[in-house]
Amino acid sequence: MIDKERLAAKCAAYGIALTAQQLDRLDAYARLLVDYNQKVNLTAITTPEGIEDRHFADSLLLAAQPEAAGAVVDVGTGAGFPGIVAKIYRPDIRLTLMEPTGKRVDFLRYACAELGLEGDRKSVV
């Protein structure tokens, strides 16, 4: 779905190196997002370029900061940005996703399970 080479090049320009495994997981996340978005309105941005630029690259810029270590709480995460992307890039962080909308929490739980991020918290507030 996403252009992995394009995303990798864009991120490399900012000093962010993505592994093949991270790119595969981001691609899987994009596919889950677009598929689930047909049932539940998660985001208006669903084109591959939009997901790469506005969801993934922006989230990765935050995740690459040294301050994004330890415990990270993503309040009002919506469809999981930047939290899930940060966890894919930085598996060492302890991630808590907080979202008040139940249908989005359902997606977050589903996406985290599918992406192998099950050890982290998804909270309904």
Where is each model-derived feature located?
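Conserved SAM-binding motif I beta-strand of class I
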Residues: 94-99
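Short, conserved acidic/polar surface loops in the N-terminal third of protein domains
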Residues: 85, 109-110
